[in-house]
């Protein structure tokens, strides 16, 4: 199907329905939870609800529409994407993939500086053509009515988008969270077309020789992000270099904050979906807790994200009715077998760049990456968490330019 321009326009009755539900919310009691130990704090949520009632979606809609949005159909799936051309005569095509609980809007602050660097104090020679798609079943890549859609299938859809729909013979890839998995899989499955892979989450490791059953936490579940050519597995403290010991300690504590949603999303997401599809406040509580737990914010979520951005995030999920299909995509992704690359030699030669943030969820020892991939760029950021381009856009912009500058 041909690519068509897309103007985002949510019907006013849907906005009014959201406000009505917010005004008639019945909140559960909450006590002794100032530190969010039991989940989203009620006092913060009440304040957020009031802001959301007064929130002007049309402002965000106009901001989204200020970018060039398009839609197409690939594998009978609706695919939304932003496509902004870079300045100069030879911008590098770069597709950026998001994860969960992200949306395409997590890249909003980095798109224009990457496409038009000279307007932001940069060098026009660093320009990119930027493509930011919404994952199938997320945001405006809806409605999703096909079962079985997952990350590996998405990888091949992205390749078709870049090569067949947009006409790029070779292109660069980047991503975080599930977007990192997709970016890495593009390099594994289509290495002849990939210029380089840039990740803001490095996960995946070889199984330790003396694997202990209680050597938790996992660097990933079995199917998530095979960054290293080999089976992913749990990491032991001994796998980390002395200067990386605190990474393992962070891994132990921070991965625990992900287990609750992973358990539900990978077992019975539809049961949760009935609640969150009906209650915008329930949806907000579910998403906000993860954003707080996985970002660098000193216990205050709004040190990492503005309240408006958080309302944008939850509104995109709510107004597109996409929580349930995003969770279904999650379920299938964790049950997808990762196939070995058809050309392992070429796949291993793909240049790899990794940015490590101090408050991310998962970490991989640098030596494991160096031994098993063509690592040419490694950055350890001084701040930031799991949502790099949204939390620290300037660090993201500077670092991704540095990596791909080596490949121009």
Ranges and model annotations:
Residues 100-114:
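The serine-hydrolase catalytic nucleophile loop
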Residues 14-86, 90, 309, 318, ...:
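Non-catalytic accessory segments flanking enzyme active sites
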Residues 113-120, 165-223, 235, 240:
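Conserved hydrolase catalytic core segment
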Residues 91-99:
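Short beta-strand element of the alpha/beta-hydrolase
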Residues 93, 127-132:
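A fold-wide structural signal in alpha/beta-hydrolase
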Residues 146-165:
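Alpha/beta-hydrolase active-site loop
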Residues 265-408:
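C-terminal subdomain of alpha/beta-hydrolase-fold enzymes, centered on the catalytic histidine
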Residues 58-59, 120-122, 131, 135-149, ...:
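Glycine-rich "HGGG/HGxG" loop immediately N-terminal to the catalytic nucleophile
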